[in-house]
Amino acid sequence: MVVSEKSKILIIGGTGYIGKYLVETSAKSGHPTFVLIRESTLVNPEKSKLIDTFKSYGVTLLFGDISNQESLLKAIKQVDVVISTVGGQQFADQVNIIKAIKEAGNIKRFLPSEFGFDVDHAHAIEPAASLFALKVKIRRMIEAEGIPYTYVICNWFADFFLPNLGQLEAKTPPRDKVVIFGDGNPKAIYVKEEDIATYTMKAVDDPRTLNKTLHMRPPANILSFNEIVSLWEEKIGKTLEKLYLSEEDILHIVQEGPMPLRVNLAICHSVFVNGDSANFEIQPSTGVEATELYPKVKYTTVDEYYNKFV
């Protein structure tokens, strides 16, 4: 039996929030792993420590920039798969990655910077709508150019939402009162960052995910806001005072509040008022579900996640 070699993977945005998990999992999964970084990143104290960790995993560092076509092309020619995890300010710059992939002609799969909600099914308000529209534009461009792809939809990052249960500015889950977005009934989906990386790396060489959207929908983690609050109340043996933030209240804050808060609340409106995270069926012609493809992966449930906070 011939064992196929694991693909060589380039991660662009590898020192970012979700990127670092993908770099670690890629390297530990046996993929020859490359990370495109700017030389200026080496002098950033926080990032330089992360880069030392990457080196300890055997990761190859390639100096370059998403806006420097020459460095991008040189990096892409060395690998089989390109994964982009760039942040919102660089979503549009992924056009450069697409151009370089087309010119290089050797890429078996491109995973653009998705790792959130399915923008083809979301009904977001501004300022989130513009960010989602950029992702949609990149998707259509990839498809038009005939580049092999996988779009990774992980919904909420568990570590982003669950530690404070969506309570702005808080560091731990509430123990007295909780603010709930909308009526708290629409379902949303939460996935631990390490699990996101595990499912993603299983998908990169899987023919079943080629030219498909990979949806992460761990059954135990499809919960409404009210269900998460109830779960937390059971853990601490206490009933919390509940304050419901109406759609009208959310829209007012989105219009009047400071910028980072406006984006986050606009996304919360999409997820918790519209239910855009889980209110549609996955179409087999365009999408697959991670826990069905990889049933042996033991994912962290929301229930387990909260044990460390009790």
From Swiss-Prot:
GO CC annotations, alphabetized: cytoplasm
InterPro entries linked to this entry: NAD(P)-bd_dom_sf, NmrA-like, NmrA-type/Isoflavone_red_sf, PCBER-like
BP-aspect Gene Ontology terms: alkaloid metabolic process; nicotine biosynthetic process; secondary metabolite biosynthetic process
GO molecular function: oxidoreductase activity
Keyword ATP-binding carried by entry: no
Induction: Induced by methyl jasmonate in roots.
UniProt function note: Involved in the biosynthesis of pyridine alkaloid natural products, leading mainly to the production of anabasine, anatabine, nicotine and nornicotine, effective deterrents against herbivores with antiparasitic and pesticide properties (neurotoxins); nornicotine serves as the precursor in the synthesis of the carcinogen compound N'-nitrosonornicotine (NNN). Reductase that may be involved in a late step of tobacco alkaloid biosynthesis. Maybe involved in either the formation of a nicotinic acid-derived precursor or the final condensation reaction of tobacco alkaloids.
Protein name: Isoflavone reductase homolog A622-like
